């Protein structure tokens, strides 16, 4: 077996030397161009005309060969630079990375748009109109769900109040007769109320929440400081890829750098494994680690506070309203992830459902539009560059004209996918697989992208024997992903409506 060892710095240095050689060649060509173009005009006799044509032909051939050599040299230097960047990227990947490379959702600019400049604008209008129609259709099917549920709850409360008043009127004589006893019982209950105990409990709970806040902030700051060197290295790699014209890879590494800073891993200790015959069922509740997970933990404190005070209230309409308010806070701040997978090893059939809390979906939607737009800009830049290198100047102009449309289409209607691997230990004995690998292909969606399922690749890394049919890519059921507009207009109001809906 043969191995090739490459030092990226040496490759980059070689590329620099070749670039210097290219500069020398260009200077020589320019120097030669002066004497061949600066000659006096030939005389009108036949001999002078023949000599002039001979030298003119050689001059044209010299310029043609020089241009071809310059183009070849430029492409060769670019290849070396990209090779150095690729080796650096490989070294970074071998050092261990949490998230995979970002796959561009729409990497290629259509050839038709390049041939007919401005075609991308028509596609932008068509995509935007389609997504707006989908957004309106989903909203009109269930308009203002949260507001309608609030109104429905008020109707229930008024019905309860009316029933209580009707009962009081119907039993008014008995209530009057029992009034002295009821007042005496209320006074006794008030005198027996242990105010000091509840005050102590409230103070203790507030101290606990304050400690949780301080500890979590400290962990987040520590994680950011620890991840800063890796961020700098990955940003340097992205910048180098940008310099050599590999714009999509630069955008991908920029996203990976920021993601690795905010999310350092997953806590997969909360796993439930079940087997029945050849079917393996796995229920995992991974928790985010890193600054983003710490931020989500801090976001849950108000909901915990609200739940604590709600629990102190006696059963009443006021408590029901307080519980609904608590449920709203919990829904908006719950960062939980739950993955439920079922695989039949014999038939390689299975299902996967993944449920994400609103903060996670909102985070992806917030970052989605800018990132998808940036990726579209990178794709247009590469298209322009490739067209120029190929001498297709019309195509370069067309791609330049269409670039703003592609950028806006990415911001509104496109998606860029980020691979998120999660390794879940099974704890199963050999020869069963010790680990289930779930690589979620999570999208960064444009603002108007309608709800859609995500996909995932299932594998069994470390299995004693290869399992036929794996790795395999499946459609993930559960929480859909979408752009910011359908998320805020439809999805979140629907989730809040479910949160305050009375139990059947």
From Swiss-Prot:
Family: Belongs to the mycobacterial PE family. PGRS subfamily.
Main function: Supports mycobacterial virulence via inhibition of phagosome maturation and host inducible nitric oxide synthase (iNOS) expression. May promote the survival within macrophages by disturbing the cytokines profiles and blocking the endoplasmic reticulum (ER) stress-mediated apoptosis. May also affect bacterial cell wall composition.
Self-association and partners: Interacts with host Toll-like receptor 2 (TLR2).
Name of the featured protein: PE-PGRS family protein PE_PGRS62
Localization, UniProt: Secreted, Cell wall
Biotechnological utility: Exhibits vaccine potential. Immunogenicity is demonstrated in BALB/c mice. Interaction with TLR2 induces activation of human dendritic cells (DCs). Immunization with this protein induces a significant number of CD8+ T cells and a strong Th1-type response, with high gamma interferon (IFN-gamma) and low interleukin-4 responses, and activation of the bactericidal activity of macrophages. Identified T-cell epitopes may contribute to immunity against tuberculosis if included in a vaccine.
SUPFAM superfamilies linked to this entry: PE/PPE dimer-like (SSF140459)
GO cellular component, one term: extracellular region
Organism: Mycobacterium tuberculosis (strain ATCC 25618 / H37Rv)
Recorded superkingdom: Bacteria
Pfam families the record matches: PE
Keywords: Cell wall, Secreted, Virulence
Location (main, coarse): secreted
